[in-house]
Amino acid sequence: MSQVLFQQLVPLLVKCKDCEERRGSVRVSIELQSLSNPVHRKDLVIRLTDDTDPFFLYNLVISEEDFQSLKLQQGLLVDFLAFPQKFIDLLQQCMQEHAKETPRFLLQLLSSATLLENSPVLLNVVETNPFKHLIHLSLKLLPGNDVEIKKFLAGCLKCSKEEKLSLTRSLDDVTRQLHITQETLSEKMQELDKLRSEWASHTASLTNKHSQELTAEKEKALQTQVQCQQQHEQQKKELETLHQRNIHQLQSRLSELEAANKELTERKYKGDSTVRELKAKLAGVEEELQRAKQEVLSLRRENCTLDTECHEKEKHINQLQTKVAVLEQEIKDKDQLVLRTKEAFDTIQEQKVALEENGEKNQIQLGKLEATIKSLSAELLKANEIIKKLQGDLKTLMGKLKLKNTVTIQQEKLLAEKEEMLQKERKESQDAGQFLRAKEQEVCRLQEQLETTVQKLEESKQLLKNNEKLITWLNKELNENQLVRKQDTLGTSATPHSTSNSTIRSGLSPNLNVVDRLNYPSCGIGYPVSSALTFQNAFPHVVAAKNTSHPISGPKVHFNLQLTKPSASIDGQPGAAVNRPCSNDKENGETLGLESKYLKRREASIPLRGLSQNLLSDSDHQKDGMLGAFQLSSKPTVLPSSSSAYFPGQLPSS
């Protein structure tokens, strides 16, 4: 059983005797053969072959015994099992270093003969460096004999035949699959053609159907568009009234917000000042707290020292008390001794008569005893004085300790009170900070509301500007209509006087074809021209001024946003400004005002947007006066409660 470990083309350097070096590539194959008959052993087979030369064959069989001798000869450090992998690593390093200019590892094939024919060769793995060429491994390979070459060629032929068989089989499989795929492709192409024809007919029917549905949907969409336009006009009127109300509310809200903003800013400044004061107080209280803590630490240290001194004094007092107890015991013993001596003295006095001989001796002894008693009494007095002094010192120390304890207790109480005050101040400062934050949030919210209201105000102002531009355009259109009418009336100046008077009274010539609705291309909406009579009733001073200054010119639309109260002019003669003709107009056949057909109420009329707040308020104040003053000479009309946007006397469409 053989296991191929390595089989690749390896570049090497070929050196023959008396020949130049040449580079070439040789296929190196390494196999591990394991034999079990008669003894289990493993052999390493190294074979060199050349793909271009089939007779180039060198073999080397290394058994475990051969490897041991090789290991001893060349000083190898690996065992037989690890040797193949190390040899493969060296070959791979030679392959990697081959492309470099100065390769570090080289594979050399050395021959002692002039040609590589039947002579053994040496395969060396050389490591090059600037100092020396080191040979890591040198293997002696023997050329193959005829039998080995024939076996090798037979094996190569067998491998090539097997490869050919496998390739022919794969070719047959591929051709079979190709035929199958071609057949399926033709079937799929036929199905695709059928599907295309079906799809074309289906798409044609669908396009016809969808075109019919699309026309029906277009008609429905046109109907819905008309309905939506009508709804839009109604919503537009409602939105204009709502817009005016919103402007009133926003202006009042703006004034309230400004007042609230002022109050909040004042409160903020007051809060800032209180916060500064509280911070200053807090800093002072913290300094006092630090001082008190330092005093407490110093007092605690003194207390510790006094405690140690007190313990030492107590120890000293205990020692003195023990000494006093010893002395008292001695005094008691001596008192007993004195009592005994007294008893002996009594017995001696009693026995004095009998013992007169020993009287002198007893008197001497008695004198000695009295001297000892005196000395003992003096010592007792001294000991009593020492005890009294120690008791006095102990009382003074205890008094000092009591004083220091009382002082420390008072200091701790003061510290606790100051800490409570500090906590209260901190709570107050936190509450003030939270109040300030809430106020700041409220101020930000109010500022945002103020910005939105200001933005809405600016939008309404922009709308007013657009409406003023529209008014100027209306004036221009009216002037152009008046000029056209003037040119037409110049051609018909020969008509009877009665017809001119009737046309003057009615406001415009009946022959003039005045368009009911003026189309404004800039707005995209057709606006109706309101009645001149209602305009004169609403703004009598404007019409009178225009008639006196420009008697020839036609009716113009003017707006005075700051209107005076027209009660006097309206109550006086409501129809005077309408029916008063000018002398120059009589001569030229011109009329001042519009025809009676334009004074009728239009159901489809749309009021203009964006009237200013002052004009609306004035129109509301003048509503009752205008209703009383607006009367036609032939047919009285009933006015509704609401007025038009640009002509306060015109009726809006309901």
From Swiss-Prot:
Primary localization:
cytoplasm
Q: Which residues are annotated with the PTM Phosphoserine?
A: S509, S612, S654
Where is composition skewed (Low complexity) in this entry?
Answer: 634-644
- Please name the GO terms of the biological process aspect recorded for this protein, alphabetically: centriole replication; positive regulation of centriole replication; positive regulation of G1/S transition of mitotic cell cycle; positive regulation of spindle assembly; regulation of mitotic spindle organization
What Gene Ontology terms describe where this protein resides (cellular component)? centriole; centrosome; cytoplasm; deuterosome; procentriole replication complex
Q: Where in the cell is it found?
A: Cytoplasm, Cytoskeleton, Microtubule organizing center, Centrosome; Cytoplasm, Cytoskeleton, Microtubule organizing center, Centrosome, Centriole
Q: Where is this region: Disordered?
A: 568-589, 634-654
One Pfam family of this chain: Sas6_CC
Record keywords = Cell cycle, Coiled coil, Cytoplasm, Cytoskeleton, Phosphoprotein, Ubl conjugation
The PISA domain covers which part of the protein?
A: 39-91
How it assembles, according to the record, is: Nine homodimers form a cartwheel structure with an internal diameter of 23 nm and radial spokes connecting to the microtubule triplets. Forms a complex with CPAP and STIL. Interacts with FBXW5. Interacts with NUP62 and TUBG1 at the centrosome. Interacts with CENATAC; the interaction increases with CENATAC acetylation. Interacts with FZR1; the interaction is regulated by CENATAC and leads to SASS6 proteasomal degradation.
Protein purpose: Central scaffolding component of the centrioles ensuring their 9-fold symmetry. Required for centrosome biogenesis and duplication. Required both for mother-centriole-dependent centriole duplication and deuterosome-dependent centriole amplification in multiciliated cells. Not required for centriole formation in embryonic stem cells but necessary to maintain centriole architecture. Required for the recruitment of STIL to the procentriole and for STIL-mediated centriole amplification.
Name it: Spindle assembly abnormal protein 6 homolog
Identify the species of origin: Mus musculus
